[in-house]
């Protein structure tokens, strides 16, 4: 007669296999070329061909201090920080498919747009811009991005099927 262990051992085997698969699906990205995280989060996380970049504020990567000055300088610093995170995974702004911009003053929208456009020269990604009451360390702008690796986003053609 064989002992009856029930389903419990099977459940643990499946659970452990699932946890291992999840761990293999997520890669944490960190580069010294961008500011270190100022909280319990990563600069970016990659799952398959998707890269999720945490919001960047205008911190100098070397000093960790906020870049002072006008919204133009802050926006450039933020986008340069994002470029460094993308570069850590051999990606560029051409790989970005979605951005979210957080501004403390929508009066800065036009200036941010002009600078943003100089980084996204062709086929700009989908984007949301929202005004918030405050950002960490007194920043005036924060931007987060989602990027696709391996050129996946440019290999698909969309067709209008409405008519």
Language-model regions, residue ranges each:
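Short, Lys/Arg-enriched N-terminal segments with co-localized hydrophobic residues
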Residues: 9-24
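Short, polar/acidic, helix-capping and beta-turn segments at strand->helix junctions
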Residues: 25-163
């Amino acid at each position: 007669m064989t002992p009856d262990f029930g389903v419990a051992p099977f459940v643990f085997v499946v659970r452990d296999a699932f946890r291992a698969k999840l761990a293999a699906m997520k890669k944490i990205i960190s580069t010294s070329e961008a500011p270190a995280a100022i909280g319990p989060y990563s600069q970016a996380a990659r799952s398959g061909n998707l890269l999720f970049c945490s919001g960047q504020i205008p911190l100098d990567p070397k000093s960790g201090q906020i870049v002072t000055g006008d919204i133009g300088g802050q926006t450039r610093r933020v986008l340069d920080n994002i470029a460094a995170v993308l570069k850590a995974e051999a990606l560029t702004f051409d790989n970005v498919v979605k951005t979210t911009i957080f501004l403390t003053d929508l009066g800065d929208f036009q200036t941010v747009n002009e600078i943003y456009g100089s980084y996204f020269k062709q086929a700009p990604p989908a984007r949301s811009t929202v005004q918030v009451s405050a950002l960490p360390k007194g920043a005036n702008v924060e931007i987060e991005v989602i990027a696709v690796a391996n050129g996946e986003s440019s290999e698909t053609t969309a067709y209008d099927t409405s008519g």
